[in-house]
Amino acid sequence: MLCLGLMSGTSADGVDAVLARFQGAPDRPEWQLLSHHHSPYPAALRDELVRIGQGEPRPAAALLDLAEAVTEQQAIAARGADPDQRASLIGCHGQTLWHRPPSSTRRGASWQLLQAPLLAQLLVRPVVHDFRAADLALGGQGAPLVPRADAALIGPGDGWRGVLNLGGIANLTLIPPRWGPQKQEPVLGWDCGPANSLIDLAMEQFSDGQQLFDRDGAMAAAGRCDNDVIQRWLQEPYFQLSPPKSTGRECFGQEDLRRRLHELGSVERADAVATLTGFTAAVVAQDLDRLSADRSIHLLELLVAGGGCRNPVLMSELQRRCRGLAVRASDQIGLAAEAREALVFALLAWWHHRGHPGNAPAITGATRETCLGVRVDPA
């Protein structure tokens, strides 16, 4: 079956679309990535999404206009990846505006902006969307949803495999080995903390909006990382939580950056970016160290996807702080780094079609497995 996956992440830089073929057993499907297309958001749309995602209020009419604009951008990306309309089903994550994990006093909730009936009409094909809602209704975090799909797409290795996505947020998947005493362990996954979100916001601020990210890690490479500050930041409450846990720009956005820059004091801009880059790597390394100490899970390799894997300074920091762990881009095993999350949502749509569960209680904390997503057919 040919499926189209659409993903726009917390970086709000645009939409990734992939066309993929799936067949066979849902847990270990035969799959082929046929095309990948990235469609950037217009600058004004990206700016508005980032601001709202950090808590700036907007009237209902403006949010309605924004939902329509986001939906139209999804359709543009879909046509770029599938110009001949070969896909028979579309999986679309939508644009996350706000994510509220569950707490002891309040259920979780998450808002992915999308007008799914409009998208189905624009593309003249059924759309599966709202993937987080069912897991949240079962008491789960609603995210991350990628780990179970990672395990199906990549499969086990000779030891524990880690898959790290460095988008706006750093989220981690751990796939148990194919043999040995830990082969029956569940797939694990959680949001570690900020990946590119704080780095990107700092670059935009320091360049007066001219640079939206640290291309090739050039700014970080020119600065010095303050490890004393990083060690202090690592003691913050979110980084002390055990999984399941999830987060987003509502926690690691402009206000958080403002606080961290204030704590850094009057340092050079390059030093600030170097410290934020080192912080991203340190957050991941701390989680892996705890996993090793608490559960005797030792990774054989760490595959890195998302835009952050194109930042050589960040990759070097990961390699250094993870103390010799083999760190490499997911491209090296045939999983295109920038296409991975869109491929996941193509798979989740196929799973919905097959009635196969897409969440994993060991990852999200939901009370049980369930099929994810809501299907909308063209009128």
What are these regions (language model features)?
Residues 2, 102-110, 121, 125-211, ...:
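Phosphate-binding/catalytic loop of phosphoryl-transfer enzymes
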Residues 1-34, 39, 159-178:
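Gly/Thr-rich phosphate-binding beta-strand-loop-beta motif of the actin/hexokinase/Hsp70
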Residues 53-114:
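Short beta-strand-loop/turn "lid" adjacent to the catalytic site in phosphate-handling enzymes
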Residues 12, 274, 278, 331-378:
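Glycine-rich phosphate-binding/hydrolytic loop that grips phosphoryl groups
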Residues 299-319:
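Glycine-rich phosphate-binding loops at beta-strand->alpha-helix junctions
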Residues 73-81, 269-296:
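Phosphate/ATP-binding catalytic cores across multiple sugar-kinase/actin-like superfamilies
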Residues 14-20, 24-33, 38-41, 185-281, ...:
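Conserved ATP-utilizing enzyme core subdomain
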Residues 86, 264, 272, 287-295, ...:
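Non-transmembrane, aqueous-exposed alpha-helical and coiled segments at domain scale
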